[in-house]
Amino acid sequence: SVEMIETEGLQIHRYEKKSFWISGGDERNFIDPHLWLDPWNAIRMVQRISQELTEADPESAGRYQENSKFLQQKLKRLDQHLEQDLDTLKQKPFAVFHPAYTYLEKRFDLMRVGVVNIHPERPPGARHLAKLRRMMQQNGIECLFREPQFEPRLTDMLLQGTKVRSAVLD
C-alpha cells in the first residue's frame, strides 16, 4: 500500500489540535485528509500512483505513464477552469456544513468564514449555532454549502428567517 500523505510536494493543511478527528495523540491525525481537492495535489498524487504501479508492474509501465499523463492534463485544465470560474467569488464570504474544502478554498483564495458541524461524530451545540448565525449575518454571508450525505434539517433550521441561501456542494 502507498501512503499518499508522504508524496513529495503536496500542500498539506492541518486542523487545529482543539478541533476534531483527534485520536491517540498521533500528529498525522491533525492533517486534513481531503488532499485531492487542490488540483495540484491531485496531480502529484497521480504521478506517485503511476510511479508506484510502474515499479510493481514494469511490463505495463507505458500504459501507466500514458494514463498518468492524460489525467494530469485533465487536472491542469480543471485547475485553469476553476481559477477562472471562482475568480469572481474570492471576496464573497460563505459557510459550509462540514470543513472538507480547505484545500480548494486555499488554492483559489476563497473566503470561508463559518462551519456548521466541526466534528463529524457529534452534532453542533446550540451555542455554536447561535454564534454561527450571528457571524453569518455580520459578515454578509449569502450562501451556506451543505453536502448531500448530510441531513439538511440542521442547515434549514439555521437559515430560517435569514436571506442566506443553501446550496449542495458535492
Label the model's feature ranges:
Residues S1-D170:
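Extracytoplasmic metal-acquisition and chelation regions
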